């Protein structure tokens, strides 16, 4: 196995480099790859270069050149002269807010209504409600993704496509809401409202 994982890591890195060079379409590729890798935990390998290296962009903030959209975002937060956040935040982060705040809780609601037996539906309400609230408040989506993947793998593919389209929507409209961990209500309020 020692020779397999470096090849997989290199392939993921190649997709990342491709996405970083394609603008808005690259944000679609980024979103699709990111969501597809969530269920196996490999999304960390994919997104980290965008957050911390030149793959996520390079910008001058306060006279200092900074690499990576998250590093740039954090530097801009500290810079009183910032009037608008770095554009690559729209390409590689803001789309997550659409998904964590709206799509994933709606998926929980759809799974609830898809249960035909009302007794079983009532038993799963607490489970699905806790998943939806966790996602909405903190942006942690893995429990919903696993439930969806086990319930209907084809819908998981559709969910990944919707996730990617959220990135495109933010890239086209120029929505630049940064984050430090995930894209739940807490970070939306901190970085998108206040």
Region spans (language model):
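Transmembrane alpha-helical segments in integral membrane proteins
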Residues: 1, 48, 91-119
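Signature of multi-pass transmembrane helix bundles
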Residues: 1-53, 171-174, 178-194
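Hydrophobic alpha-helical scaffolding
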Residues: 2, 19-23, 40-41, 97-101, ...
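A near-ubiquitous, low-amplitude feature marking generic local secondary-structure context
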Residues: 2, 15-19, 90, 94, ...
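Membrane-interfacial loop-to-helix junctions in multi-pass transporters
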Residues: 16-29, 80-84, 118-127, 155-158
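Interfacial loop/helix-cap signal at membrane boundaries in integral membrane proteins
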Residues: 21-92
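Residues in flexible loops and secondary-structure boundaries
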Residues: 48-50, 54, 119, 148, ...
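Transmembrane alpha-helical segments and their short flanking loops
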Residues: 60-89, 105-109, 113, 127-194
């Amino acid at each position: 196995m020692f020779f397999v994982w470096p090849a997989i890591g290199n392939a993921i890195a190649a997709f990342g480099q491709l996405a970083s060079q394609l603008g808005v379409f690259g944000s679609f590729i980024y979103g699709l790859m990111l969501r597809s890798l969530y269920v196996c935990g490999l999304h960390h390998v994919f997104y980290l270069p965008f957050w911390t290296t030149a793959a996520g962009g390079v910008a001058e903030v306060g006279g200092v050149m900074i690499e990576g959209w998250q590093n740039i975002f954090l530097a801009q937060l500290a810079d009183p002269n910032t009037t608008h956040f770095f554009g690559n935040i729209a390409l590689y982060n803001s789309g997550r807010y659409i998904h964590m705040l709206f799509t994933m809780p709606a998926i929980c609601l759809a799974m609830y209504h898809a249960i035909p037996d009302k007794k079983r539906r009532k038993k799963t309400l607490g489970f699905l409600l806790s998943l939806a609230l966790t996602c909405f408040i903190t942006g942690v989506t893995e429990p919903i993704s696993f439930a969806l993947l086990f319930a209907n793998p084809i819908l998981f593919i559709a969910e990944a496509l919707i996730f990617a389209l959220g990135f495109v929507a933010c890239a086209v409209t120029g929505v630049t809401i940064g984050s430090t961990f995930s894209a739940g209500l807490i970070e939306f309020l901190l970085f998108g409202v206040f």
